């Protein structure tokens, strides 16, 4: 009996232990898991990377979208907000300038483990990451959204119901001769031409104002021939494109600006006039007449002195020279026109003295600001977004502008996709500057109304997916817009308000959003929406 017992007791104990382990495992599986740490942004004015300090070494999920701020050789940084050059938001020393500096310094995370190629400006929803330090994350998961190459290939930015499309575009040293400024090898030059040509054909503008072209006719002649060989047609009426350019007397190895226009849509009145203050061949002006309506406007395309070639007073001199030329040119008996559109690479940020010459001294309107408040950019420098490629108009022209936007095919791209560093032949990163687009619906009977939009605009929810904006539109006068931002300041949607009762689709992702109604770059109504 004892022998029997001694043989079988260990087996019974082992079986009991197995059963208990199974029951213990079942109990563990039934218990709720430790809640995942979610990082939120309750107050954007005070939020910083310090909130992550307790979670170093742990995994967290960011409830607010994170945005790609830099992408250099597949090395990425992300932040809850886009980093801007401070002078894009305010003059040095102003509250806006200082706030931009604070935001830029509040947080920036390098992030490893991202697969595939992503552009600056792409957003990551529900980013799951390991916190390595207050400046370093490791990717564990998330959903990418927005600003992809596919979206940009699908069409141009929304510019409203325009009849004429005007494009200002710095081509980044478009030369036919091989030299240190442009392409250095024949294969690089061929690839540069293909990339530029794809961009110009995709934009398909009625008038191009081109910057950084080789002096003389060789470069522009090749470019225009390729455009016409593409057999493009004008959107809407499908009129065949017939691009022309001007044979100027500029010779040499340096750069110039140039007009390229569709002779089936517009006619130049005479030939371009220019001012050579500070630098030659880089400030031209011409009046165009729309063939369909007979309406006219003056187009000024420019390339001001670079920031590293003298103080801001030199670019201020250039701005004054442009206005002096305009005030003389518009009095010409064959012109008699006040509608002015100034575009080009002015090599200065929005809140600097050269721009103040136009906006403050001559009461012109900064279209980046009018249409996009403080979210506009066309260029990246020092890992910060900004715009030095401007679109500024006279008040007499403003009501005839249906829309304006930079087309972000270049500034958000990794530098590794340039024509001289890759075999990529797409339009992306064909230049270091984004083309800037302006839609025109010329009508000289329209009158600019500088009065602010009345504060009776109302924002309220429709159904679960809709937002209604009431009394923010005035027919025949002021133009107003709405913009939807996340609480972290990421722009989700923005369009013109075109009716007295205007319906807006809310973003699909759940979260907290701030909706603005604004006019003349100033918000007049704001509402927080929880989705």
Named regions from a protein language model:
Residues 3-7, 13:
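Short, positively charged and aromatic/hydrophobic N-terminal segments
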Residues 7-8, 21-31:
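Sec-dependent N-terminal signal peptides
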Residues 8-10, 452-531:
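C-terminal outer-membrane/trafficking sorting elements
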Residues 35-179, 187-194, 275-280, 315-320, ...:
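Extended non-catalytic accessory segments flanking core domains
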Residues 38-47, 51-55, 62, 119-152, ...:
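Metal-dependent phosphoester-hydrolase catalytic domains
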Residues 135-255, 297, 314-323, 335-339, ...:
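N-terminal, active-site-proximal structural segment of metallo-dependent hydrolase catalytic domains
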Residues 158-166, 264-267, 280-306:
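Beta-strand-turn-beta hairpins that frame and shape the catalytic cleft
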Residues 171, 212-213, 302-304, 344-346:
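Active-site metal-binding loops of divalent metal-dependent hydrolases
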């Amino acid at each position: 009996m004892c022998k029997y017992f001694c043989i079988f007791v260990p087996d019974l104990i082992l079986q009991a232990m197995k059963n208990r382990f199974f029951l213990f495992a079942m109990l563990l599986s039934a218990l709720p898991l430790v809640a995942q740490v979610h990082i939120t942004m309750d107050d954007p004015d005070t939020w910083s990377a310090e909130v992550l300090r307790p979670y170093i070494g742990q995994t967290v999920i960011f409830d607010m979208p994170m945005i790609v701020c830099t992408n250099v050789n597949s090395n990425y940084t992300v932040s809850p907000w886009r980093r801007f050059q401070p002078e894009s938001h305010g003059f040095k020393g102003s509250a806006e300038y200082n706030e931009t500096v604070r935001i830029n310094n509040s947080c920036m995370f390098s992030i490893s483990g991202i697969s595939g190629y992503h552009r600056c400006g792409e957003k990551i929803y529900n980013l799951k990451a390991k916190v390595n330090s207050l400046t370093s994350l490791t990717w564990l998961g998330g959903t990418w959204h927005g600003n992809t190459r596919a979206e940009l290939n699908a069409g141009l930015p929304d510019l409203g119901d325009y009849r004429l499309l005007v494009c200002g575009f710095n081509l980044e040293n478009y030369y036919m001769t091989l030299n240190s400024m442009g392409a250095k090898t024949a294969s690089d030059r061929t690839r540069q031409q293909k990339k530029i040509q794809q961009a110009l054909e995709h934009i398909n503008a009625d008038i191009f104002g081109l910057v950084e072209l080789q002096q003389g006719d060789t470069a522009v002649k090749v470019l225009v021939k390729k455009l016409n060989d593409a057999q493009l047609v004008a959107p809407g009426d499908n009129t065949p494109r017939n691009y022309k350019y001007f044979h100027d007397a500029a010779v040499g190895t340096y750069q110039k600006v140039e007009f390229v226009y569709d002779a089936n849509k517009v006619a130049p009145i005479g030939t371009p006039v220019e001012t050579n203050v500070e630098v030659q061949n880089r400030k031209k002006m011409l009046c165009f007449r729309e063939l369909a309506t007979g309406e006219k406007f003056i187009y000024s395309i420019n390339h001001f002195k670079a920031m590293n070639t003298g103080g801001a007073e030199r670019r201020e001199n250039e701005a004054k020279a442009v206005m002096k030329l305009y005030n003389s040119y518009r009095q010409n008996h064959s012109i008699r026109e006040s509608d002015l559109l100034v575009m080009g690479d002015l090599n200065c940020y929005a809140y600097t003295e050269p721009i103040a010459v136009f906006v403050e001294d001559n009461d012109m309107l900064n279209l980046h600001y009018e249409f996009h408040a403080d979210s506009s950019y066309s260029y990246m420098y020092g890992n910060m977004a900004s715009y030095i490629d401007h679109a500024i108009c006279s008040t007499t022209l403003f009501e005839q502008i249906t829309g304006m936007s930079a087309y972000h095919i270049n500034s958000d791209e990794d530098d590794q996709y340039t024509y001289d560093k890759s075999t990529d032949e797409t339009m992306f990163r064909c230049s270091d500057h984004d083309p800037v687009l302006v839609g025109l619906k010329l009508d000289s009977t329209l009158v600019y109304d500088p009065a602010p939009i009345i504060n009776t605009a109302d924002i309220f929810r429709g159904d679960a997916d809709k937002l209604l904006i009431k009394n923010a539109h005035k027919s025949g006068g002021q133009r107003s817009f709405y913009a939807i931002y996340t609480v972290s300041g990421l722009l989700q949607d923005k369009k013109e308000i075109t009716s007295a009762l205007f319906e807006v689709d809310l973003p699909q992702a759940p979260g907290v959003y701030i909706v603005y109604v604004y006019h003349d770059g100033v918000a007049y109504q704001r509402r927080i929406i929880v989705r």
